[in-house]
């Protein structure tokens, strides 16, 4: 794969040949997690990890200028696309000390390299989610080989779109380009870690492009009577589940068109309406569009975001009960 990096800007034929000769990738989830925990605890003993609490304090709306990879025109077959995504997709999550057994565990979500220089894109809630019973946790990223990279800092974030950039030390990892403007009906692919089943590859279609607003929160995390600005989302039929937050949704050229955010079970009864039986549930998968990720490269994002709330409407929000894809 190191040779492949030098060929990506050369002949399309050579790229396909190099990928075709790749060995089949086989993941052992137990070995993968054991390696992360062993490496993570060793790094902790040497003072190389940042606590989740310290990183959580850095998650505020801010942008950072980045040099992004150019949009790709290279077409990949699905197996080759999976290989390409695995070079840039990470397991991102917390190494935590279990309050029940006292052992260390790794709780994985996802992220992907978005810019050369070790910049990883993931969801804000991957960092912000808290378990009151866990007293000690540290944020890590791991590639498909199980190599562990401590998350050093939060470079940029937009809590409204639930998207952030974090810094690791892995300059050799290849970034995925962003692509805006995808339409409903286009085919997309996802590489994620649903339920701890790492590096699962799925495909589907963009079923809808939509905008959604949510209740705006004040500095104490309470609703303040306003709605957020409208956030651009894609609904996709490519399957993912909790454990997939932050995973890339890409086109056939490995351009990131969105990032996994949350899942809604359409068809559930209205909360508090226990008299009606739930209708058959259909998972509706929400992914934050690449346009929202691109906003994080605006160094003036904090000022712009302050002007984008509007008076809260009186109508109910459409949709069912949402849960994070984490």
Which role does the model predict for each range below?
Residues 6-16:
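Bacterial N-terminal signal peptides
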Residues 108, 115-159, 184, 271-273:
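Catalytic-histidine neighborhood of serine endopeptidases
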